[in-house]
Amino acid sequence: TYNLGPLLVDAFIRTESGFDPVATSSVDARGLMQMTEETFLWLRSKIAADEDLAFADLYDPDTSIRFGCYYLHLCLERYNGDVATAAAAYHSGWGTVDNLLRMEEHSADGQTLQGFPYSQMNHYVNKITSCYGAYQRIYAGN
């Protein structure tokens, strides 16, 4: 979906929800790909404006993956395909990442983050990139 490889999508699903389709976070993010209502409503206006979808529909795996993959695609597109920077944006929001990119101590080129200064962001990005790397090693040659 949205030209995303299945290993990358699986890394996000594993990190976000542990493959639990009815996962709900402490900030009420929902589903396999853990999306907040604000993000869901924004994305719904872009890809499903004519569909009768509610926030609770993110508990449906197909809906969660569809919306989560679209959002991940937008993050990767915005941050030039850099998985770590896109993961930081998926987790913490574009505004946070855009602000960090303007700081030389966090980005040499203003386009990719060199480090992740917030502990939750750093932990999240490390989980995504480690899981994605492990999947790539496991499935290399398949």
What spans do the regions from the language model cover?
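Catalytic glycan-binding domains that act on GlcNAc-containing polysaccharides
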Residues: 1-142
